[in-house]
Amino acid sequence: MCIRDRFTTWTLLILLGSYCFGFRRTISFAVCFVALRKYSNGYHAKTYIHCLLLSLILQSVSMILIKALPTKFFGFVWIFSDFVILKIAPVNNNQLHLTQSELSALKERIPYVLFFVNLTCIILRSPPIEKTLSNELEGLTAAMLSDALTLLIFVLKKIYGRIIHGNESKKSNEKIS
């Protein structure tokens, strides 16, 4: 993806997100999501338009789900997201292929990134802070959920491909754990 496409994607995500969910929630989502995606890799669309549409849908769905969920249940989202990310990430795919050494390096760093994100969420969840920074907490929680969902989409797409194509498809070294 070229710089112009990235700029367009992030501009649209931040504008739409800010309009629908608030600027602070959207920025905290974007920062956390980029940090998580850097290490987990997840699903990558084949075309720019497909990527843009999936990004907009994923951001919107995760923000709506988190906004509707009482904060007392955020811990379950964190645990679910952590489990999925730790179990599946990083993944390899045709759109962004990583070497084995790159995969190993990312796998080693993922727990540290998750620790930092979880610690930030726990601090934001504390009673005196939560009242003033609830938007940021929702954005971080939505980003964790979104990253976990991209990994699940990747795995489900691989399983679907194996069911449809059976063993006749070419072997790949894509990890689905």
Language model: regions and residue ranges:
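Short, highly charged, low-complexity non-transmembrane loops/tails of multi-pass membrane proteins
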Residues: 160-177
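Hydrophobic alpha-helical transmembrane segments in multi-pass integral membrane proteins
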Residues: 62-72, 115-131
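Cytoplasmic-side transmembrane-helix entry/capping segments in multi-pass membrane proteins
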Residues: 46-57, 75-79, 103-108
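C-terminal ends of transmembrane helices
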Residues: 33-44, 90-98, 155
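Membrane-helix boundary/juxtamembrane motif in polytopic membrane proteins
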Residues: 93-117
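Structural signature of hydrophobic alpha-helical transmembrane segments
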Residues: 17-29, 75-81
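Short, small-residue-biased leader/transition segments that mark boundaries at the very start
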Residues: 1-3
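Interfacial aromatic-anchored transmembrane helix boundaries in multi-pass membrane proteins
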Residues: 37-65
